[in-house]
């Protein structure tokens, strides 16, 4: 198990991104590896992610985040319960013309995210330390995304005030959450759903895209 970023990690990222159809620039590749280095370093002292082995982080964090990038459009994005920064940090790196907000209620995690912003010079990234229910932005977001955050019922109920009829809600899930879809609030509908294949990851991955009906 490596304690730092290696050439193997760099190659795995390049190959995996190509497999996903994501064309990384040299700068984006470098920034993603810089983010990985910070994640490995800080995870030794803070519990940023349950994935302790750095050799698993490229597939389970970076490539998993990149797998949804083709569904992203430029705009104002919110990553709810961002934790260690997935998928918000990769989103900010791949979409430099978008404004990305990473929100988490855990102070250790938002301190890490702030350090990532400073060290990688991600001027399009905002880090907010708050409970999602208490967060009151000046205007609605174009997109709200979560990865392993909560049930879809909670995700939509807790973020309803952060979007409007034009907002897309993206829920990154493992096994298809058919039971959670049944429990969606009445003013939300499933817009589309997509099975994802993430290089190096075992198990199912799904992306569900929701919209408000009112």
Curated annotation (Swiss-Prot):
Keywords assigned by UniProt, alphabetized: Cytoplasm, Methyltransferase, rRNA processing, S-adenosyl-L-methionine, Transferase
Organism: Pseudomonas fluorescens (strain Pf0-1)
Matching Gene3D superfamilies: Vaccinia Virus protein VP39
Subcellular location: Cytoplasm
Family to which the UniProt record says this protein belongs: Belongs to the methyltransferase superfamily. RNA methyltransferase RsmG family.
Protein name per UniProt: Ribosomal RNA small subunit methyltransferase G
GO cellular component: cytosol
Record function comment: Specifically methylates the N7 position of guanine in position 527 of 16S rRNA.
Name of the top EC class for this enzyme: transferase
